[in-house]
């Protein structure tokens, strides 16, 4: 039975000055038979204002308060007591270490770096941080065991109430020995072989054996597992910045920022695993910056070696869904004197609505079998980059519970061992099974067809659910139903497809795709390394030039436009496509395909072939032939190299927008060769080649944010109609699309050579955290720039006299086929008319500035279009002039020259205020 809860809350202050003390270490003590009173697992720290709250139900009643530069204070409570508004006074102390004396009293005012022995100490540690550790050796191998557990925290319910009574089987699995009662719901164990080579720098981790049981094995694993791996990835305190929780934290051993970013205090000399060590405490200068509080335990000799460290994420940091995150890491000395990692313990508490109830996560990693001498076989590092590469989970050997009892270096607790029984009982409960199925459907976008809606057991899943209903101007309400097979049906052969119907165009659409993978898969064809052959047939609506990888065209979110939509430039396209793809472990991949399409103009799009004829007087006459449709035969080869990337590919073969880490660079070179056949409708036919290159990378600036950068360039080498030209990616939805132009209309500009730049800087609260009042909102600033510079060569410009066979650029049909009716008296095209034109000499540019982390998941951006707010169109119209220049209200008349010939000018487009400026939102959960 659970014991009574003992709790206390209050403020810690300086006993002399009354100043509040932040970051005081507060923990309950527990009694042992041979060591007396020792720190328990129940602890916390005071916040920036010195406030604290702590409680436990394990029977602990002695509380310890410890602060750098102050005498330790102990407070005894009655078991079950609940005290509030307690003021705890700490007495300043002076710590001596040999001839070093540091007095951190009033540290905020008196801390100095110059002449500070703590600063000199950390400088010595930093200068020697690479000298004694295994990473300084030419090579090494080691074994590592890691265990990760997840637990539901603060399980305080009345099991006798009607609602909870049906879940009362959980009660026997509740662990009451911690701060709050919790239930362990998932365990993951890995045994790895780790390899390291210094020159050239290479690291590899091979997952030898694994065991996953519990809730994690029930939910859709894909991106969930990848994100968990990224959150709990290995970190090295010797690096200048530490990659944790999808952010960069300044390391207390940073060679560039440590001394200016942190304040250091010598606390005492203590014994750590038999070594006399200096306890060096540190706190960030700004508690809301991306840094740590903690302790470094430095061997007290001339080597300045780090024996152990304990770091915590400050509670005031601008971090979502994490109320506690700490890492404790220790080193051991090998026989040759080299220091190597010994054990790492990572603890985190995640929450959704408040930080009292949430999910506890704990990972323990133990290193053994260090070998610095045996040569590493060459094939171990074959085709690998300098980045760590982990084998696909499906290659790991799986062992039963009995075998793991002999493999793991330390046993599971009773509660960890009971997870299997808990899950077995939970999955038999209809209410819990329905909840798991609902969560799986929302996160995976698919609904399983098994009775229990278990994605791991289903042979066919319906989805994506967010594409079942959508809307667009051409189709009206679009209804779609589809799905995909899973590895439960066949682990190498997969099929997927859909049928769709528009209530306005009344045309059925469909897709049927077959995939054969050369390797066996455990869920879908794109998990792990991709190596497959894929064939598909599809008939659907497309908008020329628009890439549906940004957001699927019939996604429900794409149905919400920023303004009243016009009839789209669209086409009905039939595809018959075959594709081969091979991806290697170093993230080099090759993809080849052949695609036959039949393209039929739809909406207000027309394929109007333009021919020019020179007249006897050397003038030119223009004739137009309606092509209607054309056939296209296209081959493609794509090479991509993304060293160190961990990218989740969804069931449609599209990169997930929740893609894990984006730090790895991506280089992509694509070449298309094709033949556009329009001869059956009076066209000329075109052979074309098009080449594109893309570079994508996230650049981190330690705790000061990061820059997401994409550079893209391409060229069409031969003459071809506008459907083969480059048309920048655009977004007409109210939702912000990154790496697309949000204030440009679809197909507004045409080009056959271009360079595009997309850059977004995330400040991560760097500036806003320093503004009083604003910092309480936890907002984060973000700015972006998107620009494209390009051109249209003469061979692909249908408006140049003598350029025959090309298609007229798309435009809303003029009234009565008269171009003049589409323009006002000043030569500007009227609202409601869409046109495409060659891009001019200036680059197109737009900028955004906004705030993210509004209510933790909303981002709002103001967008401004910088260029092409008033520009020339390729259409010639007759100039209009006032009938009476002195009284324009009398009307206008067509202008003629002195010979009575019409005065022709280029029409213009003027972007209105709503076109130049916009506001868009994004829903984005981030830590």
Residues covered by each model-derived region:
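A short, amphipathic beta-strand motif
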Residues: 6-14, 50, 88
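A short, solvent-exposed beta-strand micro-motif common in secreted/extracellular proteins
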Residues: 59-69
């Amino acid at each position: 039975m659970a014991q009574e809860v003992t709790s206390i809350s209050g403020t810690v202050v300086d006993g002399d000055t009354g100043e509040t003390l932040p970051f005081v270490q507060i923990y309950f003590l527990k009694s042992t038979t041979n060591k007396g009173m020792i720190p328990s697992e129940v602890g916390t720290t005071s916040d920036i204002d010195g406030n604290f709250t702590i409680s436990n139900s394990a029977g602990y009643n002695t509380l310890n308060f410890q602060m750098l530069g102050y005498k330790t204070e102990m407070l005894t409570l009655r078991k079950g007591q609940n005290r509030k508004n307690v003021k705890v006074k700490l007495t300043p102390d002076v710590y001596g270490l040999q001839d070093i004396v540091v007095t951190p009293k009033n540290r905020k005012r008196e801390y100095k770096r110059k002449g500070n022995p703590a600063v000199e100490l950390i400088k010595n540690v930093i200068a020697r941080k690479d000298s004694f550790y295994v990473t300084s050796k030419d090579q090494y191998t080691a074994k590592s065991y890691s265990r990760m557990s997840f637990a539901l925290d603060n399980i305080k319910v009345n099991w006798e109430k009607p609602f909870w009574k049906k879940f009362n089987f959980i009660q026997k699995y509740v662990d009451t020995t911690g701060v709050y009662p919790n239930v362990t719901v998932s365990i993951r164990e890995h045994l790895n072989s780790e390899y390291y080579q210094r020159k050239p720098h290479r690291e590899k981790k091979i997952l030898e054996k694994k065991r996953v049981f519990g809730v994690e094995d029930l939910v859709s694993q894909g991106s969930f597992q990848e994100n968990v791996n990224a959150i709990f990835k290995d970190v090295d305190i010797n690096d200048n910045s530490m990659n944790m929780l999808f952010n960069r934290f300044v390391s207390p051993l940073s060679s560039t920022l440590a001394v200016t970013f942190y304040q250091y205090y010598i606390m005492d000399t203590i014994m750590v695993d038999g070594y006399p060590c200096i306890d060096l405490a540190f706190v960030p200068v700004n508690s809301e910056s991306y840094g740590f509080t903690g302790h470094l335990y430095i061997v007290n000799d001339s080597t300045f070696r780090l024996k152990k460290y304990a770091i915590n994420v400050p509670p005031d940091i601008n971090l979502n869904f994490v109320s506690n995150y700490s890492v404790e890491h220790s080193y051991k000395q090998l026989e040759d004197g080299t220091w190597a990692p010994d054990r790492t313990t990572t603890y985190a508490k995640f929450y959704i609505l408040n930080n009292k109830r949430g999910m506890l996560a704990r990972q323990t990693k133990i290193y053994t079998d260090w070998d610095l001498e045996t040569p590493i076989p060459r094939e171990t590092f074959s085709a690998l980059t300098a980045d760590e590469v982990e084998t696909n989970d499906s290659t790991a050997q799986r062992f039963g519970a009995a075998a793991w009892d002999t493999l793991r270096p330390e046993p599971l607790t009773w509660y960890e061992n009971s997870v299997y029984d808990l899950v077995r009982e939970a999955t038999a409960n209809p209410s819990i099974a329905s909840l798991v199925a609902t969560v799986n459907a929302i996160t995976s976008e698919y609904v399983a067809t098994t009775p229990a809606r278990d994605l791991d057991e289903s042979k066919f899943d319906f989805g994506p659910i967010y594409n079942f209903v959508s809307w667009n101007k051409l189709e009206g309400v679009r209804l779609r139903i589809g799905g995909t097979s899973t590895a439960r049906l066949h682990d190498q052969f997969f099929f997927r497809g859909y049928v769709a119907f528009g209530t306005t165009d009344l045309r059925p659409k469909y897709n049927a795709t077959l995939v054969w993978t050369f390797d066996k898969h455990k869920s879908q064809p794109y998990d792990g390394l991709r190596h497959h052959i894929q064939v598909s047939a599809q008939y659907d609506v497309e908008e020329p030039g628009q890439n549906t990888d940004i957001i699927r065209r019939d996604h429900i979110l794409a149905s919400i436009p920023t303004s009243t939509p016009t009839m789209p430039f669209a086409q009905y396209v039939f595809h018959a496509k075959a594709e081969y793809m091979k991806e290697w472990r170093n993230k080099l991949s090759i993809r080849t395909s052949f695609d036959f399409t039949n393209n039929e103009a739809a909406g207000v799009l027309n394929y109007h072939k333009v021919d020019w004829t020179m007249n006897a007087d050397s003038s030119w006459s223009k004739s137009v032939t309606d092509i209607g449709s054309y056939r296209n035969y296209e081959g493609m080869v794509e090479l991509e190299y993304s060293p160190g990337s961990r990218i989740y590919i969804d069931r449609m073969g599209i990169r997930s927008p929740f893609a894990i880490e984006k730090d790895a660079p991506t280089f992509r070179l694509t070449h298309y060769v094709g033949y556009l056949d329009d001869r059956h409708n009076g066209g000329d036919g075109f052979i074309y080649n098009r080449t594109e290159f893309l570079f994508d990378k996230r650049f981190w600036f330690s705790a000061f944010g990061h820059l997401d950068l994409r550079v893209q360039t391409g060229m069409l080498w031969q003459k071809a109609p506008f459907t083969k030209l480059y048309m920048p990616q655009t977004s007409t939805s109210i939702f912000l699309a990154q790496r697309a132009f949000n204030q440009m209309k679809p197909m507004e500009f045409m080009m056959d050579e271009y360079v595009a730049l997309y850059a977004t800087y995330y400040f991560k609260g760097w500036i806003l955290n320093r503004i009083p009042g604003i910092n309480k909102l936890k907002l984060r600033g973000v700015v972006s720039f998107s620009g494209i510079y390009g051109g249209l060569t003469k061979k692909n410009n249908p408006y140049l006299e003598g350029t025959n066979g090309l298609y007229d650029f798309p435009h809303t049909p003029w009234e009565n086929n008269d171009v003049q009716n589409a323009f006002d008296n000043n030569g500007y095209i009227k609202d409601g008319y869409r046109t495409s034109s060659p891009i001019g000499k200036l680059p197109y540019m737009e900028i955004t500035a906004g705030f993210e982390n509004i209510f933790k998941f909303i981002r709002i951006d103001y967008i401004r279009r910088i260029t092409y707010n008033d520009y020339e169109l390729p259409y010639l119209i007759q100039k209009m002039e006032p009938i009476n220049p002195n009284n324009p209200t009398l009307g206008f008349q067509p202008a003629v020259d002195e010979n009575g010939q019409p005065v022709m000018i280029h029409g213009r487009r003027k972007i209105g205020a709503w076109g130049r400026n916009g506001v868009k939102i994004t829903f984005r959960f981030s830590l």
